[in-house]
């Protein structure tokens, strides 16, 4: 839903903020914040436990000097263990006293609210603060949480595969490397990034950051030769070799009655999976309100699983990772698809098709479709 709003009504400032948060410079600044600035939120005071007094200077020395290379939670744990040792409590009460000491130490933090701490960082970067945590901020919030409290669960596995890697930021990958210490494989297509433009330079920088090897998969198996070549013409470059599987030519219609044309195509393909792939939910609702046929179509939703339905509608975003026998892309107008991110959206939508692909425009066709002729 957030991406749907961004695609339909995102401002230039929205996209600039995303570009900043998906940059390696942002990651370096954030790592510096995690390793230095965030630690300064700890303001120790002299602690008294019965007859035992632990001076502020001693706590400060342990935290800021002796353990300065550790994350906050490990410093707090070490100081709490030190207090338990000094107090010489019976073993049966060690855990309770240790937890009490930890709680008192965390109370010496100016704040442990991860969003509030993240906003401190954003202010220092002269970026807008957040009120709600979005996909563009969740990795940073979790990294702050990990620094403060550690992870309370072992998430490791024998092998991890992460798909759609183009949708993740350098901060996400930094988080992944902290969570999983096993071998990992990241898969994706930089041309299917729908909220930012990526390049091979980005991949090289990412590989260097996470110490990974890049392997290019240069053969397309999903679509027919006709669809694959057409999709690559939308991009204006060749990105893969095609498997020798022929099919129908991609079809384009310019008509004022978009609904009627969709219904006609659907009627001719009742035994195949058909998906009407729209730019936004607004378009889906517009079509369903105008057609009793389309009103019966299942709408793909990221929050629910797909059924066995053969007739579907989806936004381009929710169609990612899914394939259909027949794809229909309505409102393929220039006013609807005109910038570089729109180009990527059209590419993503067209690559959902296995056998047949249809574009329908009711105004001047998109410039990216005109270039394919």
In which residue ranges do the predicted regions lie?
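Alpha-helical nucleic-acid-binding subdomain
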Residues: 1-160, 166-175, 191
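Conserved helicase motor core of SF1/SF2 NTP-dependent helicases
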Residues: 126, 146-159, 166-348, 352-373
